[in-house]
């Protein structure tokens, strides 16, 4: 077994146990310290709360690390299809450990946080990352896809606000909702164009052919599955954002009428 393979397996295992520790111990202690409302939540709410705390931690780690790699790791950018061992592989190993950890938690607490779409998302991602790490290919693409995680903290924060019963149209929720919509669109929807554009640009080239049919199909299918879910979530998020903006406009119009200043 090569040292690089041992390193990636070690990173995946450390990632798994770290996120398990965060879920079962650290999140309970930390959440009770920073949010007094946490202790008043039901058992089911606490389970999902802890799951989302872990999700946020993972997203910040792999998202920021992934952005650094995308911008500055020349080894990864030099050969997007067949680039050798790089920081991108480490980032993918961290993400893999998290996905395995989260899958185990979802299955264990299925009646509380079970969601078939998350199972599909995690399985599709894990399969793709397994091929990347096993075959040493497409690390650049895998890392690029991880940039989508930068939207998760905003999605989770929205849930935290709701769990703590913040007013639906409070300033904090409105600002977070707008940021969530914008960031989600940039990293999960707008990013599709350069991704599939790159896929088209390398189609039929010698490096692409060397990938083999299995990896070629897996690359396309796993990305399409994930992107279909991203589009579905984007539609749902957009509807919520439009509803909030419409409410704000109605409130402004109402206030203008009350003040005798109809614009």
From Swiss-Prot:
It is found in: Membrane. It comes from the Eukaryota. Residues 44-246 form the TLC domain. The chain crosses the membrane at residues 7-27, 53-73, 90-110, 124-144, 173-193, 211-231. Keywords: Acetylation, Membrane, Transmembrane, Transmembrane helix. It is a multi-pass membrane protein. Its main location: membrane. This is TLC domain-containing protein 4. It comes from Homo sapiens. The gene is TLCD4.
């Amino acid at each position: 077994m090569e040292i690089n393979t041992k390193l990636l397996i070690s990173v995946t295992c450390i990632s798994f146990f770290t996120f398990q520790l965060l879920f079962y111990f650290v999140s309970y202690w930390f959440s009770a310290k920073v949010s007094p409302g946490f202790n008043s939540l039901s058992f089911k709410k606490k389970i999902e709360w802890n799951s989302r705390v872990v999700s946020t931690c993972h997203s910040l780690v792999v998202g920021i690390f992934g952005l650094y790699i995308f911008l500055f790791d020349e080894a990864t950018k030099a050969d997007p299809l067949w680039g050798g061992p790089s920081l991108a592989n480490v980032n993918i190993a961290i993400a893999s450990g998290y996905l395995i950890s989260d899958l185990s938690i979802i299955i264990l607490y299925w009646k509380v946080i079970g969601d078939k779409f998350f199972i599909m998302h995690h399985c599709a991602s894990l399969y793709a990352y397994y091929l990347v790490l096993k075959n040493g290919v497409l690390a650049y693409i895998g890392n690029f896809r991880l940039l989508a995680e930068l939207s998760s903290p905003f999605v989770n924060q929205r849930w935290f606000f709701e769990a703590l019963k913040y007013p639906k149209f409070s300033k904090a929720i409105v600002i977070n909702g707008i940021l969530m919509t914008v960031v989600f669109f940039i990293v999960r929807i707008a990013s599709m164009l350069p991704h599939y554009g790159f896929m088209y640009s390398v189609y039929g080239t010698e490096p692409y052919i060397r990938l083999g049919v299995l990896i070629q199909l897996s690359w396309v299918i796993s990305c399409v599955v994930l992107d279909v879910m991203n589009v579905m979530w984007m539609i749902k998020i957009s509807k919520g954002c439009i509803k909030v903006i419409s409410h704000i406009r109605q409130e402004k119009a109402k206030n203008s009428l009350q003040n005798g200043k109809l614009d």
